Amino acid sequence: MDKKVYRALCQEVDGRTTKCFEVFNYMINEYEDRGKTRRYEFYRKQARKELVLNLVANKKMMSALDATLKELYDGKIKVGFIEQFRSAKWLSKTFNYYLSTNQTLIEVARENGVIDEDETEIVIGGDKNESK
């Protein structure tokens, strides 16, 4: 993996995240203009769908990046030491980018009422008792 692949993957996640935030904005504007209307509920449902799609896609990509990194460290991918170091650096950067994107999506969704607090615990994968 190199900088070119990293940029391509980041552009992909940025595009999906931008679309998700646009739907969030439609929902927020509708609520501010008219309150809880049918259109607001429709936009909220759409925002929830976009959020789930983004989180699932990012999670799958993070799993693939993690598996590739493990293969690299286990020696299943045969490259020189310098190339291994560079690949590990870009894999780690990409993984962290996807992770921070997921955290941002969850925070924005929680702040704007797209998901409820108990749903946030499920999405993050924790239990309310564990987070104390």
Q: What is each PLM-predicted segment?
A:
Residues 33, 37-116:
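Acidic, low-complexity, intrinsically disordered interaction modules
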Residues 27, 76, 114, 121-123:
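Generic short N-terminal amphipathic or hydrophobic helices
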Residues 5-6, 21, 38, 80, ...:
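Residue-level detector of intrinsically disordered/flexible regions characterized by low predicted structural confidence
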Residues 7, 107, 121-123:
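Ser/Thr- (and often Asn-) enriched beta-sheet segments in non-cytosolic proteins
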Residues 117-132:
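Short acidic DE-rich linear segments
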Residues 1-34:
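Short terminal alpha-helical segments
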Residues 19-20, 39, 103, 122-126:
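Serine/threonine-rich, low-complexity intrinsically disordered segments
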